[in-house]
């Protein structure tokens, strides 16, 4: 039996793919905050805030998204991990903590680099909270569906990145 997904427990998903390129080559792509907009059917792009012009711990950006059922929205995020050629992570601002945490991890191998993109929901408030509050009996299904959407977009991202090599 599958564990029931609860937003308060910060559910997550991730996808990985081995790409035949070095971490250095891939890092040049992954450190561009707009790269996923080329492949995602939801994320449309981002702009740096507060004078930032490149990723670094503490740098902030505003991302724009579009979803056929949710509509259009923007959110502000902060880079929380920046380890060149290894790991980049950002948290989406939410009430009471991050609404979500996103990132990429790279691990060099003899076949290239394993690139993992991941997303953790919560624990701060996000658009999912209203849906869950309206249908608390469907919390597991709402979260499972959203994680499936995120995983599908992450698969598209990694496939797109691989196509650039």
Feature locations, PLM:
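Hydrophobic ligand-binding cavity/cleft-lining segments
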Residues: 1-52
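Hydrophobic-ligand-binding modules of eukaryotic lipid transfer/binding families
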Residues: 1-20, 141, 148-155, 159, ...
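Well-ordered beta-strand positions in beta-sheet-rich domains
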Residues: 14-18, 74-76, 101-103, 116-118
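Well-ordered beta-strand positions
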Residues: 18, 80-81, 107
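Hydrophobic beta-strand positions in extracellular immunoglobulin-like domains
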Residues: 19, 65, 119-121
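Glycine-rich portal/gate segments that line the openings of hydrophobic small-molecule binding cavities
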Residues: 47-101, 111, 152-156, 160-164
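Beta-strand/loop substructures that line and gate deep hydrophobic ligand-binding cavities in soluble
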Residues: 94-152
């Amino acid at each position: 039996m599958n564990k029931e997904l609860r937003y308060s427990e910060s559910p997550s998903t991730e996808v990985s793919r081995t790409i035949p390129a070095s971490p250095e080559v891939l890092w040049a792509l992954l450190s561009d905050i707009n790269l996923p907009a080329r492949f995602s059917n939801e994320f449309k792009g981002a702009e740096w805030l507060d004078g930032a012009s490149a990723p670094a711990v503490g740098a902030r950006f505003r991302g724009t998204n579009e979803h056929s059922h949710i509509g259009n929205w923007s959110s502000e995020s902060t880079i929380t991990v920046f380890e060149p050629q290894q790991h980049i992570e950002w948290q989406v601002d939410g009430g009471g903590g991050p609404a979500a945490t996103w990132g990429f991890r790279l691990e060099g191998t003899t076949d290239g680099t394993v690139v993992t993109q991941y997303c953790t929901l919560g624990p701060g408030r996000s658009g999912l909270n209203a849906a869950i509050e309206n249908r608390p009996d469907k919390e597991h299904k709402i979260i499972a569906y959203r994680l499936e959407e995120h995983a599908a977009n992450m698969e598209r991202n990694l496939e797109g990145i691989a196509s650039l090599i």
